Regions:
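Short cysteine-rich clusters marking metal-coordination/redox-active sites
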Residues: 108-112, 128-131, 173-176, 205-208
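Short, flexible, mixed-charge glycine/proline-rich loop motifs
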Residues: 93-105, 116-122, 159-170, 194-199
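Short Cys/His-rich "knuckle" micro-motifs
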Residues: 70, 116-122, 138-142, 180-187, ...
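Short alpha-helical segments that sit at the start of domains
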Residues: 2-25
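Basic, amphipathic "hinge/linker" alpha-helix immediately C-terminal to the N-terminal HTH DNA-binding motif
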Residues: 72-90
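Short acidic, hydrophobic short linear motifs in intrinsically disordered regions
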Residues: 26, 34-47
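C-terminal regulatory/effector modules of DNA-binding transcriptional regulators
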Residues: 150-151, 162-289
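A short, conserved structural fragment
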Residues: 63-72
């Protein structure tokens, strides 16, 4: 069943739930409790509110969406943990203050030159030092960057991007977990996450409205048929960065209409695998060549 997008008015109500410092402190104390249930009196003492009536009002404003109440007291709901988790994701430092310098991120698939990685404005940007190509620009929260040494940044970013793209291809929004629809976009001139491909895939969340564009090569990477082919031909995606895989950045794509079909051919040495997808990006056929 289709999910209606959350109206802006409802978002204002949700933001209002955590707009008071007492409510924020309640969430923080329950987070620190490590899923332990805290009684009303214990929670009020930890938050530091003397007026029990006023404190009960704030708890009521957070329940049941963000807090779960039972006979023993209060715990965070899944949504409550997500609110705190979102704060943690960006709390290590302002994204503009994270300076990891230029980090070696492997070889350029076009010229073989060194790929440099920098973190700017919440994105990991990879450019080739040799030919000057923009290899990829991938979003990453500050916690991903701040929690790892600079030398580990390329590996972490590659794994993080695989995780995010896998969620999308399995039908979950990367922001709110709502259902997403996948739509192919042919011959677009919009800048993709990687080099502009012949075929983009647009993922649209039916709940929050978030839109993500991936090239079709990244989408096909999550098909088990392609993973098996790569394994058989000696390509282990755990030992390389995604942007080093030429077929991901510059997929070999042919498109036909009525009905819509897109064929993506992945070649490794003398072996090739042709994958055919429909207008929902579901795999409808594959062939070794």
């Amino acid at each position: 069943m289709p999910t209606d997008r959350v109206p802006a008015a409802d978002l204002k109500d949700l933001f209002g739930q955590v707009s008071h410092e007492v409510r924020i402190q309640v969430l923080a104390e329950l987070w620190d409790a490590d899923e332990q249930t805290l009684s009303f009196s214990t929670l009020r003492e930890r938050v530091g509110v003397r007026d029990s009536g006023n404190f009960n009002y704030h708890l009521g404003s957070l329940t049941p969406e963000l807090l779960r109440r039972d006979k023993n007291g209060y715990t965070l709901t899944y949504a409550g943990r997500q609110v705190v988790g979102a704060a943690v994701a960006g709390s290590y430092t302002d994204a503009t203050e994270l300076d990891v310098g230029n980090v070696d991120a492997g070889a350029c698939p076009s010229c073989g030159g060194r790929v440099d990685t920098v973190y700017e404005d919440g994105d990991v940007v990879m450019d080739c030092r040799g030919c000057g190509d923009l290899i990829a620009r991938l979003p990453a929260p500050p916690v991903v960057i701040a929690a790892h040494d600079a030398d580990a940044l390329p590996r972490v970013v590659s794994d993080h991007f695989q995780t995010q793209s896998a969620r999308l291809t399995r039908g979950f929004c990367k922001l709110c977990d709502g259902p997403v629809t996948a739509t192919p976009t042919v011959a677009t001139d919009r800048d993709a996450l990687t080099n502009p491909p012949e075929l983009d895939v647009t993922f649209t969340c039916q709940a929050c409205g978030d839109i993500t564009h991936l090239n079709v090569g990244v989408v096909t990477l999550h098909f088990p048929e392609l993973r098996a082919f790569l394994h058989e031909t000696g390509v282990d995606i755990r030992d390389c960065y995604l942007w080093e895989l030429d077929f991901l950045l510059k997929p070999n794509v042919s498109v036909s209409e009525d009905p819509f079909r897109a064929e993506i051919v992945v070649t490794v040495d003398d072996e090739a695998l042709a994958l055919t997808v429909d207008d929902s990006l579901a795999l409808v056929g594959y062939e070794r060549r």
